[in-house]
Amino acid sequence: MSQKVLPTKINLIQFRRQLRLITVIKRLLENKREVLLLYLRTYASEYEKIYNEVNEEMKKVYESYLQAVASEGISNIEEIALSQKPSLEVSSSIKVIFGVKVPTIKLDKSTIPSKPFSDVETSPYLSESYEEMTEAFNKIIELVELESTIRSLVSELRKTQRLINSIDNYILPFYRGSIKFIKQILEDRQREEFSRLKIIRRILQRRRESGSG
């Protein structure tokens, strides 16, 4: 590829400047990669923490629910569930983390359905299951937001790594090879010119010597 480069001093200067610029860009990309990894480690740790909390809360929800089913009967529970229309709403927006757009998700608490049964007429386990599930909603939303954030950061990290790989595997070798090629041609020309001048000096010297004789 470097054989197609025109071997001139101007090109040598330009290629050296571009090589320095590309080296700076690579360093900036490597710094970005390190920061993204730091963010990812932080969010992954937070995700694991919230995930475990949600797991524990959902276990309590299911335990209460199963006890309610045993007490009320599955048909009564299903009848209560089917009487309710889907009402939960969330809002989303975008925030920027180190140049990466990530989602923020908020649960509209006013859309959480009110308890569709009487505490007096139904099993206390059903009420307990409802309250525990209501408390778990915010954690679940937080978990979804963290997962989306991690996905966005991983995607940006992969793009950054691809750019670094491209610089390492293609761009830097091209410029280094081109600079080496131009330098070699210019040095060869310089040696040829020096040899030519030496020959001319000898010829002129001989002529002077012949003329003086």
UniProtKB/Swiss-Prot annotation:
Coiled coil: none
A cellular component annotation (GO) from this entry: plasma membrane
Entry membrane topology: Peripheral membrane protein
Gene Ontology terms, MF aspect: ATP binding; proton-transporting ATP synthase activity, rotational mechanism; proton-transporting ATPase activity, rotational mechanism
Keywords: ATP synthesis, Cell membrane, Hydrogen ion transport, Ion transport, Membrane, Transport
InterPro entries per UniProt: V_ATPase_D
Subcellular location: Cell membrane
Family: Belongs to the V-ATPase D subunit family.
Biological function: Component of the A-type ATP synthase that produces ATP from ADP in the presence of a proton gradient across the membrane.
Entries under PANTHER family matching the protein: V-TYPE ATP SYNTHASE SUBUNIT D
Subunit relationships: Has multiple subunits with at least A(3), B(3), C, D, E, F, H, I and proteolipid K(x).
The protein, known as: A-type ATP synthase subunit D
Species this protein is from: Saccharolobus islandicus (strain Y.N.15.51 / Yellowstone #2)
